Structures are given as C-alpha cells and as structure tokens.
Amino acid sequence: MRHSALLLAAALVAAPLSAQTDDGTTFRWSGTVASGHFIRLHNLNGDVRIERGAPGSKVEVIGQRTVRGGDGSLVRFDIRMRDDGDVVVCALWGPDMRCTDDGARGRYDSNWRRRERVSVALRVRVPDGVKSYARSTNGGISVDGVTAEVDASTTNGDVRVRTSSGLVNATTTNGSITVALGSAGGDAPMRFTTTNGAVTVYAPPALSADLEMSTTNGGVSMDFPVTVSGTMSGRQIRGTLGGGGRSIIMRSTNGDVALRRNGI
C-alpha cells in the first residue's frame, strides 16, 4: 500500500513535466499548473512573451532558438516542479548550468556564449488563475491579457504588461516600463522601477493607493487627484489616491514617470 502511494506521488510530480519535445531548434512543453501558482520562466538572452490561454487549458511553452553561429542545440531547456506547486522553466546556456527552484544556476562561461551565438524567444500561454513570473537578462518581457499576478524583471529590455486582474511588479535597468492595470484585490504593494527609461502606468479610475513617484532626470505627471502627504514637485510626488491602502512605487533615474487613466 505504501509502495503504491509512493508511486502515485511520483507520478503526480512527473506528470506536468512529461509533455515536452525538442528538435534542436524549437522546444515545446505543455502541462498543468494549478490556479494560484506561478509558472516561473527564466531566460538569459532573448525575449519572453506571455499571453492569456484558453479557459481551463494547460500552460503552453515554446522556446524558439535563433542561431547566428555555433550549435543551437547546446542551449538546453529544463523543467522542474517546486515543492510549493510552482513550475520552473529554464533556458540553460552552457554545459555547467542547471535549473533550480530559483532559476538557472551554475558557472556561466561567457566565452562559450560568444562562440555559440544563440538567442531564445520564450512564448507562453497561461490559463486564467495561473500567475506569471518572468526573468531575462538581454531581452524584453511582454505580458498580455492575463488574469492573475505578474512579476516581470529584465536587465536590458522593455517590460510591457496588460492585465485584467492581479498584482503587477515590473523592473528593468535599461528599458522602459508600460503597465495597464486591471483590478487588484488586497493590499500588497506594487513596484515599477527602471534606471534608464520611462515608467508609465495606466490604472482604473477608482484606484486607491499610497503613491510614491520619483525621477532624477525627467518629470512626473498624473491624471488622478492626489492628497499630498509629503513632497510634490516636478520630479517627485508622494501622496494618497482615493482612500489610500496599498503602496505603489514608481521610479526612474533617467526618464519620465507617469500615472494615467485607462489602458494601453
């Protein structure tokens, strides 16, 4: 009996990881991620695009290699399920990298990358209720139409997010951030930050929040009435929207910061 239970548990863990193919150019995976859990996407060199899938469908991931030199098949993909039920998808550059619960880890040989000039475009469809977590280093991130939480971060690239509901957090270093928020219950904070680029957030007219907007080299502007609780200038606003509540932080170093009504 105990042996049967162990086999069943192993099957349940392995099931979401089984439906995958890779022909050396295109990687495909589809599997179930429970509502309320994250699909966690880790790329290094290339864009990540996430779209809303059909209701009740599985998560679908396509990794498309673009090869400008070397052997594209040496860029590998790995999938793992975390103990908390989240599913991790990693694009791995080089033989010494591995996929962990926290993403791609291990020694990264930059000389190998120069020899194997490969980028990977990740295209993902998520059903309602599945949360999206996306990371890249050299590539943009776009998320369109999803219904649950989004956490998106890159180093060199723009971040664009449009949701109908759920929290959003977005960061980049060299790129702009454009976010269209839907409804977001609870009082968890949201952050939108970049170093070199603009930050623009479109929000519902009934938005209530404790707001902090700032830039060093640029301007701040907004379409909402605000009750000032701190500094208000051409480069910084700190105040309360509506009845206040969740913290919303919008920051840039070199770029404008704007809070607008309506959508992208």
Predicted regions and their residues:
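N-terminal signal peptide c-region/cleavage motif recognized by signal peptidases
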Residues: 14-16
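Acidic (Asp/Glu) and glycine-rich low-complexity loops/linkers
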Residues: 19-42, 47-135, 144, 151-153, ...
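Hydrophobic lipid-interacting interfaces of membrane-associated proteins
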Residues: 139, 157, 175, 197, ...
